[in-house]
Amino acid sequence: MKIVGISGSNVGSKTRTAMDYTLQIAREKYPDADITLLDLAEYEMVFSDGRDYREYEGDTKVVTEMIMAADAIIIGTPVFQASIPATLKNIFDLLPVNAFRDKVVSMLVTAGTAKHYLMVEQQLKPILAYMKAHIVPTYVFIEEKDFHRKEIINDDVIFRMERLVEDTVLLVDAYVKIRAAKDAEYDF
């Protein structure tokens, strides 16, 4: 199983910290999984101009091809101005409409206050649904108060991250079995 984590901003440290924790949990629980972090702060991405993602070069091509090859994607995003960051939106714009077909996508969100939790429901989930993702219904929402010196200090957040990883992997396994059963119906 190939899992790609996306740290969806090119500024700040909280989302990257949360993604590091989450992917470490995934590595410990599922050592056979191929797990990669794409921290968008570490890549020089160009803005989407409507081309097919395979026509781009450099970091843009690397990032989009890694996402397209994944079985599961864990998106980490901060909330900026009550919305997703432009760097993450650009990733969605670079990919085809059906980019997440047969992929499981889960989310964790960092925000300054609890008032921004609806961003996931009203913006991120509709984008992922439009792109045909199998969305893990629950997500991890982490507030400013849950961090101290680039560490997560809320044990409940760690527990929810563990559950998010488990739900993501279980959903991938379930969809693999469903597709195999569906394919077995055809006798050619």
PLM regions and their residue ranges:
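N-terminal beta1-alpha1-beta2 submodule of the flavodoxin-like/Rossmannoid cofactor-binding fold
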Residues: M1-T77, S83-K89, D155, F159-E162, ...
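Alpha-helix N-cap/loop-to-helix initiation residues
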Residues: V11-T15, Q81, T113-H116, K150
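FMN-binding flavodoxin-like domain, especially the glycine-rich phosphate-binding loop
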Residues: I25, K29-Y30, R101, S106-F188
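Flexible, active-site-adjacent loop/turn segments at secondary-structure boundaries
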Residues: L38-A41, M45, P78, D93, ...
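Helix-loop-strand module that forms the ligand-binding subsite of alpha/beta enzymes
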Residues: E55-M131
